[in-house]
């Protein structure tokens, strides 16, 4: 059984998961196409973070919701540790983020992922997301999917 809870952006387990995600992404993409969000650069009011833990309390995955100035929000930092993949945790993370967005009456959720992350693209499609054009602050990037 897994649990999902909201955590502060400075949570040490969240920092560990995000560092694993950053290392993974740096192997896939050059720096100019690596759109990682440094959580410490975002105010607490702009960000909500969640973490998934296994039955032993071990951090298994994470995600975040970044509130944008135009009144929409972006799904960020979705990551599942490799040993926990294939258990529908991605769907649970996205669903939890969507609940947070709904509670904030956000009219639109967006996201960016990379072309080399086919499982992530498949996850977002299963969750009902469709490919669209780049949105601010992004510019079109052949290695990104929006």
What residue spans do the PLM features occupy?
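Acetyl-CoA-dependent GNAT
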Residues: 2-76, 81-83, 94-96, 100, ...
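C-terminal "cap" of GNAT-fold acetyltransferases
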Residues: 2-3, 7-10, 107-110, 114-146
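Residues that form or flank phosphate/diphosphate-binding pockets in enzymes
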Residues: 60, 88, 119
């Amino acid at each position: 059984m897994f649990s999902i809870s909201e955590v502060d952006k400075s949570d040490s387990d969240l920092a560990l998961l995000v560092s694993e995600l950053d290392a993974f992404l740096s192997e896939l993409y050059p720096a100019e196409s690596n759109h990682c969000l440094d959580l410490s650069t975002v105010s607490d009011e702009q960000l909500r973070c969640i973490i998934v833990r296994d039955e032993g309390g071990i951090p298994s995955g994470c995600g975040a919701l970044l509130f944008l100035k135009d009144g929409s929000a972006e799904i960020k930092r979705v990551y599942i540790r490799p040993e926990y993949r294939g258990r529908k945790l991605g769907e649970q993370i996205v669903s939890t983020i969507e609940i947070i967005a709904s509670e904030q009456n956000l009219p639109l959720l967006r996201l960016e992922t990379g072309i080399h992350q086919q499982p992530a693209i498949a996850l977002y499609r299963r969750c009902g997301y469709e490919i669209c054009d780049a949105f601010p602050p992004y510019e079109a990037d052949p290695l990104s999917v929006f």
